[in-house]
């Protein structure tokens, strides 16, 4: 059989084309991977809170419950939210509420009040610039009527127009039958921690 000799120029060109394609493919795959990582990292706080699975990953302590509640507060009053985002965040917020608080604040009523409060904050140009949360070791705790209670202080540092002010709230939480701490109610207080 007769075998035709390979042209060295053609072989060299084919090898160069394959090398360029291989190197180009590597860099393209790397670039796409970096873009995907950036997309995952660049979620807003609103998106992160909306995606929280509180049914499966409920916070383990009363303080952790209030940390999530405070993150929600900052979003309500500091971010420009759509109606859908407000509703989704309110639904997440209500997962932190005790049954008694839910009875007094059905979802639709809660969302309506929340929208009015957000609008009031926006008109007054009030934003939350920082939040202080009492340490769990310093919290008031008690057992009463077969329930465990935990009271924690939260300080909200607000920017109002050109000035600043601080408001303190006392949150009352109760542990439910599943061992989950839920917000029973809160009130404005002069106490600080």
Predicted regions: what they are:
Residues 2, 34-44, 164-193:
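Short beta-strand edge/turn micro-motifs at domain boundaries
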Residues 2-81:
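Juxtamembrane and targeting peptides
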Residues 45-123:
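Core segments of small alpha/beta cavity-forming domains
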Residues 65, 150, 167-169:
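Hydrophobic core residues within well-ordered beta-strands of beta-rich domains
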Residues 98, 161-164:
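Glycine-centered tight beta-turn/hairpin loop motif at sheet-sheet or coil-to-beta transitions
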Residues 108, 135-137, 154-158, 171, ...:
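A mature extracytoplasmic/lumenal domain signature
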Residues 113-161:
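Surface-exposed, charged secondary-structure patches
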């Amino acid at each position: 059989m007769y075998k035709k000799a390979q042209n060295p120029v053609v072989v060299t060109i084919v090898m160069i084309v394959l090398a360029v394609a291989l190197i180009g493919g590597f860099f393209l795959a790397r670039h796409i991977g970096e873009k995907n990582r950036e997309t995952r990292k660049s979620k807003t706080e609103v998106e992160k809170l909306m995606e929280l699975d509180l049914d499966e990953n409920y916070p383990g302590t009363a303080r952790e419950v209030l940390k999530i509640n405070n993150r929600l507060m900052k979003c309500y009053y500091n971010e420009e939210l759509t109606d859908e985002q407000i509703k989704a965040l309110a639904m997440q917020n209500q997962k932190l509420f005790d049954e008694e608080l839910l009875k007094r604040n059905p979802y639709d009523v809660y969302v309506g009040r929340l929208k009015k409060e957000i609008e009031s904050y926006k008109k007054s140009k009030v934003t939350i610039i920082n939040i202080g949360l009492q340490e769990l070791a310093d919290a008031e705790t008690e057992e009463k009527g077969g329930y465990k209670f935990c009271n924690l202080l939260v300080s909200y540092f607000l920017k109002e127009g050109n000035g600043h002010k601080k408001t303190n709230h006392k949150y009352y939480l109760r542990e439910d039958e599943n061992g989950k701490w839920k917000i029973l109610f809160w009130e404005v207080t002069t106490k600080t921690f």
